[in-house]
């Protein structure tokens, strides 16, 4: 596993305020360059995510982008579901519950998102930006 991911995993060990952390993007896919950033999605109610990102950047020596799983839009949520690799779970079943909810959300939201995208593109084509 990527050393930066192992460092983040160790940094999060024992933290119960960060309920779930998933790495995604090039580090999860194994296509990262040595200076690539680290994309981490978290479920961490009440945690200052900018401070968390800064702390993780400090310990890894890399830019760490932290996104809130509760605020992820449809395209990003789909990517995290497909690519996300769990690096921290504060209790048994946290990831399973999150994935079940995310898949249910995607099941209903993806068709709506696709319709809105097509409608927006049609408006842009007809009227311009």
Question: What is the predicted function of each stretch?
Answer:
Residues 39-41:
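Short, well-ordered beta-strand segments
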Residues 1-20, 28-34, 43-129:
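Catalytic core of pol beta-like nucleotidyltransferases
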